[in-house]
């Protein structure tokens, strides 16, 4: 546990906290809770995915951890406090070793680490001194929770009920602004994830052939990721033939047929930092003339969208650029007429038959990472770039996607060493010999 969390080093997490507390109002404290361990069936539980804000600020992944930041506290020892689970020999027998206080300090750089059982008393004394409280919540625009209150929401409800006369603020806006701009250490973690994704894709490209099942392709990715200390960044999409027209197809149980394409939206995560990749490759190792025609159109759209990425660009304007580029390609392919393009309403009804999603999203500790959607892009943002064309009547969906860093001078692909052009894909797949005759 400690080795994974400490990969960035305590100085990075200390820097993150310094930037966040600088934006708090005077006499304010902020509280961040880890995520719940969620049940499955019977006595089973899901693997804990740490609260990304807590990890960003501390590097600690362990369940039930709480961070309190109070930069204006009268006593210096109260300005940063990390609460971790109480030591339990019985728990160690069943679940293994948990963090000691010294290990939590080594990972996070926080000098004062306390047992969770002491939280209520210490927090009450801090609240007697504080005037404003920053509470955290998942404010991602597409977040949807049906299982009841999250740990953060339960804490917020209880805190407001017990201390109704305090002022309360939203921590999420500060966290989203800070997390959007990646530090050099964070970018290096994402580069490592991209490198592992590259190695896995190269392995898979030489493995795919007619008769292979989508689940076997998933297993090849899993072997490469897990063997090298990574994991899937998200549930993999391995979609052969018409399955590629379902945007988030995850059954991954169909057989790849000769002459079809298979869309691979699969990427690695390392030390909680994610990458995101999509390639669409020919099952038989060679594109048909029609497949190549459409593939190259998507590739040109990718290049145009990639070149448009730069500081100052706003997400909604980037989407407009993508829509205009893809509309032109669809007209050139004979799939739309100029009259259909011109007569569309604001909902882009004609375009949406073939391209119906955004052109990219922020990525980092979350795959669909936090960002302020109306904010201009800045150097240090890491985005995906993923135009596509889906043609249901031809049983074909082609999407191309890289993880891309925004710099002062424009976009830099962190996956530039992963083949994307149609000829490069065919060359990579042919390295195992002529198997398509």
What are these regions (language model features)?
Residues 1-437:
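Active-site neighborhoods and metal-handling regions in enzymes and metal-associated proteins
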């Amino acid at each position: 546990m400690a080795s994974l969390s400490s990969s960035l080093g305590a100085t990075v997490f200390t820097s993150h906290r310094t930037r966040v507390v600088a934006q708090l109002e005077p006499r304010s404290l902020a509280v961040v809770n880890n995520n719940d361990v969620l049940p499955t069936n019977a006595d089973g539980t899901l693997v804990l995915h740490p609260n990304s804000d807590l990890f960003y600020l501390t590097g600690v992944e362990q369940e039930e951890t709480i961070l309190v930041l109070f930069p204006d506290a009268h006593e210096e020892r109260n300005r940063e406090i990390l609460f971790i689970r109480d030591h339990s020999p019985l728990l160690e027998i069943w679940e293994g070793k948990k963090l000691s206080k010294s290990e939590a300090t080594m990972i996070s750089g926080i000098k004062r680490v306390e047992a969770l059982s002491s939280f209520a008393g210490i927090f009450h004394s801090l609240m007697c001194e504080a005037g404003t409280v920053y509470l955290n919540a998942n404010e991602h625009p597409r977040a949807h929770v049906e299982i009841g209150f999250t740990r953060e929401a339960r804490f917020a409800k209880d805190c407001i009920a017990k201390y109704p006369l305090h002022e309360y603020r939203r921590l999420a806006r500060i966290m989203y602004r800070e997390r959007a701009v990646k530090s050099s250490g964070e970018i290096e973690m994402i580069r490592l994830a991209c490198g592992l994704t590259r190695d896995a894709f190269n392995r898979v490209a030489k493995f795919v052939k007619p008769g292979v099942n989508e689940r076997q392709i998933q297993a090849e990715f899993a072997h490469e990721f897990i063997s090298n200390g990574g994991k899937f960044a998200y549930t993999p999409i391995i979609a052969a033939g018409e399955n590629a027209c379902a945007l988030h197809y995850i059954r991954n149980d169909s057989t790849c047929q000769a002459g079809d394409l298979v869309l691979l939206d699969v990427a690695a995560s390392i030390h909680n930092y994610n990458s995101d990749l999509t390639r669409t490759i020919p099952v038989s190792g060679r594109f048909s003339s029609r497949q190549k025609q459409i593939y190259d159109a998507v590739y040109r759209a990718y290049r145009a969208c990639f070149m448009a990425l730069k500081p100052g660009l706003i997400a909604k304007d980037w989407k407009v650029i993508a829509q205009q580029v893809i509309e032109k390609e669809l007209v050139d392919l004979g799939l739309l007429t100029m009259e259909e393009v011109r007569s569309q309403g604001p909902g882009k009804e004609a375009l949406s038959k073939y391209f119906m999603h955004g052109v990219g999203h922020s990525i980092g500790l979350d795959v669909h990472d936090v960002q302020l959607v109306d904010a201009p892009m800045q150097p240090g943002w890491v985005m995906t770039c993923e135009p596509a064309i889906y043609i249901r009547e031809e049983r074909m969906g082609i999407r191309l996607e890289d993880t891309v860093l925004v710099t002062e001078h424009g976009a830099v692909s962190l996956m530039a060493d992963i083949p994307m052009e149609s000829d490069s894909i065919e060359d990579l797949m042919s390295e195992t010999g002529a198997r398509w005759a």
